[in-house]
Amino acid sequence: MEYKTLRRDEHFFGLGEKTGKLDRRGESYKMWNSDKPCYSVVEDPLYKSIPFFMSSYRYGIFLDNTYKTEFKFGTESRDYYSFEAPGGEMIYYFIFGKDYKEIMKQYVALTGQPIMPPKWALGFAQCRGLLTTEKLSYEIAEGYRKRGIPCDIIYQDIGWTQYLQDFNWRKENYQNPKKMLADLKGMGFKVIVSQDPVISQANKKQWEEADRLGYLVKDSTTGKSYDMPWPWGGNCGVVDFTIPEVADWG
């Protein structure tokens, strides 16, 4: 655990995808990637962990630790804040800069600069939890174009899959997905499907094929494909995307 002096007028920003107010002072946060459906405005942790924050006193701290770390911004004392990890080495980087932009520039130089996404990926994206039918996708696309509202992307939520966690289109919701994708492309839309990196055992054929090909993450204790309970889709096998052949197979 590391303790730092907490100034009376100090404020903190960062940590990535977190609920609540932008100023992190007076709150505590855990870094532990978690799939939380229908989360509340105070839920923590969530999907993404970025153990980096910036202070209003012109510095940033990046905690380089992959364990279940925790940040406490004055929740235990008015005089200090802290961050901790249950294991691994306590390695962190203190980054000073004249402003937030300079601090971010140094942080990116340390962690690596992300690639610039294609222009369409920076546009407006239509996404909602119930967007899981071909009919609704057409209605939404036509509505945007009819009203002249700019939109570049239409998402299909997890219900596009047959068993909630696999790589097959849900037959009763999508009569001709190939044509739908072509039609939406013709209207100027890109389509992104929501996809977790797992295959539900409910899709017995696909799960057994992935298991036979060795495309699922192995349980180190048994040597068999790891059996992962998932929030939806039941027990699943985790697809090992570090295997180059998996991308072509999926």
Regions found by a protein language model. Give the residues of each.
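Catalytic and substrate-binding clefts that recognize carbohydrates or anionic sugar/phosphate headgroups
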Residues: 1-118, 127-129, 134, 141-146, ...
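Aromatic-lined carbohydrate-binding/catalytic grooves of carbohydrate-active enzymes
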Residues: 16, 115-249
